[in-house]
Design a protein with these regions (language model features):
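C-terminal motif of bacterial Sec signal peptides marking the signal peptidase cleavage site
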Residues: 30-33
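Short beta-strand elements
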Residues: 160-193
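Glycine-centered loop-to-beta-strand initiation motif
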Residues: 128-138
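N-terminal segment of the mature soluble domain
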Residues: 186-258
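Short secondary-structure boundary motifs at beta->alpha junctions and helix caps
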Residues: 285-329
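Short amphipathic beta-strand segments in non-cytosolic proteins
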Residues: 85, 107-125
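Beta-strand-rich structural segments
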Residues: 77-106, 136-138
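Surface-exposed short loop/turn segments
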Residues: 35-36, 238-289
Length: 330
C-alpha cells in the first residue's frame, strides 16, 4: 500500500508486485536450470567413466583367458536312453605353457530334456580340480539325442555379456564334446511299414535297405509290419496302428515305423554317369499308446556309373541318414 499526493490530498493505493514476482521467478528458474545442467553433466561424465571402467574389466578378462585352452580328454561311448554313461566326460584346462590350471571356473552346458523334438539345455558352474581337470557324468535321460556338451570359461556376473568382444573371446575358447544317447528301439525293436516307390510313384516293396541298416545299427528285433498292405499308404496313421496292434499288441515290439521312400528327381543321364534324388518321410509311433514320437524327412542326391548303381548308392546314403535320425531321435 502506498500514499500518493494528488490535488493536495494523500490517496491510499494498492500496488501489485507482478514485476517483482516475475523477476524473482525468472531468477529462480535460471538458478534451477543451472543446477540441473550441472547435475546432468556430472551424471553423464560419471556414466562415461563407469562405462570405460566396465569395459576395462572385460578387456582384462579377455586377456586372462587368451592364455588358456580347454581340451578334451575322454568322451564315453553312446548309451541307450534310461541308462547312465559308464564313464565320465573329461576335459582339462591348460595355460600357455601347457600346464594344468587348478580351480579355474568353467560353465558347462548340457542337454536335460526334449520338448516337441527340440533339445533343451541347462548349465552348471564347475571348477577344475588340482590337476586342472573337469569330470562330468549326467543323470540318465528319458530321451535320445545326438548333440554336444559345451565347456566355456565362466564369465563373472559383473561383466556385460552384451560386449561383443567378450562373447567372441569366450566362444573361441569353447570346447564341444559329442554326447550320444540312443533310442530304446535298440532293445525294444520295431515293425516296419516303409514302402519304396519307383520313378512312376508306385509302391514296390517294404524297404529291405532300411531294414538291413537298422539291424546293422544294433536293432535286432526288427521286421516288416504284419499288416503291410499298400492300401494304408496315405490313410490316417491310427488306422495302420490299430490294425497292427490287433495282431502284435503293444509290448511285443516297441515301435511302428511308417513312411515312404520316393524319387524326388528321377534317374537322369549326366556327363560322368547318372544322378537321382530320393526323399524319405518317416514317422515313429509308440506301440504302447499310438503316440507319434518322431517325424523326420531326409533328401539325398547321389550319382552312379549306371541306373542301378545310381539308385543303389542313393538308397544307401539315404537310409544311413534316416536310420541315424531314428536311432538318435526316436
Amino acid at each position: 500500500i502506498k500514499y500518493i499526493l494528488k490535488k493536495g490530498k494523500y490517496i491510499k493505493m494498492r500496488v501489485k508486485s507482478k514485476i517483482v514476482l516475475l523477476l524473482f521467478s525468472i531468477a529462480l528458474i535460471s538458478f534451477s536450470s543451472c543446477a540441473t545442467t550441472k547435475n546432468a553433466t556430472s551424471t553423464q561424465t560419471e556414466k562415461k567413466i563407469n562405462k570405460t571402467q566396465k569395459y576395462d574389466l572385460e578387456e582384462q578378462f579377455i586377456s586372462e583367458i587368451s592364455n588358456i585352452s580347454i581340451e578334451s580328454l575322454e568322451i564315453p561311448k553312446p548309451v541307450i536312453k534310461g541308462r547312465k554313461f559308464k564313464s565320465d566326460f573329461k576335459s582339462i584346462v591348460k595355460n600357455a605353457e601347457g600346464n594344468p590350471v587348478a580351480n579355474f571356473p568353467v560353465q558347462l552346458k548340457f542337454p536335460i530334456s526334449k520338448v516337441d523334438g527340440k533339445i533343451e539345455y541347462s548349465t552348471l558352474l564347475l571348477h577344475t580340480s588340482e590337476d586342472g581337470t573337469i569330470s562330468f557324468n549326467p543323470e540318465s535321460t528319458s530321451f535320445s539325442c545326438d548333440t554336444f556338451i559345451e565347456l566355456t570359461p565362466a564369465i563373472p556376473e559383473t561383466l556385460n555379456i552384451e560386449y561383443e568382444k567378450l562373447t567372441e573371446a569366450v566362444a573361441a575358447k569353447t570346447l564341444k564334446q559329442s554326447i550320444k544317447i540312443k533310442s530304446d528301439i535298440i532293445n525294444k525293436g520295431a515293425v516296419l511299414f516303409v514302402w519304396e516307390h519307383n520313378e512312376k510313384g508306385r509302391p514296390t516293396s517294404n524297404s529291405y535297405t532300411m531294414l538291413s541298416e537298422l539291424r546293422r545299427n544294433g536293432v535286432a528285433l526288427i521286421g516288416n509290419a504284419p499288416v503291410s498292405d499298400t492300401s494304408f499308404i496315405g490313410k490316417p496313421l491310427k488306422e495302420l496302428y490299430d490294425a497292427n496292434y490287433e495282431v502284435i499288441g503293444g509290448t511285443m515290439y516297441g515301435y511302428l515305423l511308417y513312411g515312404t521312400i520316393k524319387f524326388e528327381v528321377p534317374v537322369t543321364k549326366v556327363d560322368d554317369g547318372y544322378t537321382c534324388t530320393l526323399v524319405a518321410e518317416i514317422v515313429g509311433i509308440d506301440m504302447k499308446n499310438g503316440e507319434t514320437t518322431l517325424t523326420t524327412s531326409v533328401s539325398c542326391t547321389a550319382t552312379g556309373s549306371n541306373w542301378n548303381n545310381c539308385v543303389s548308392n542313393c538308397k544307401s546314403e539315404l537310409t544311413t541318414s534316416i536310420v541315424n535320425n531314428i536311432i538318435y531321435g526316436l
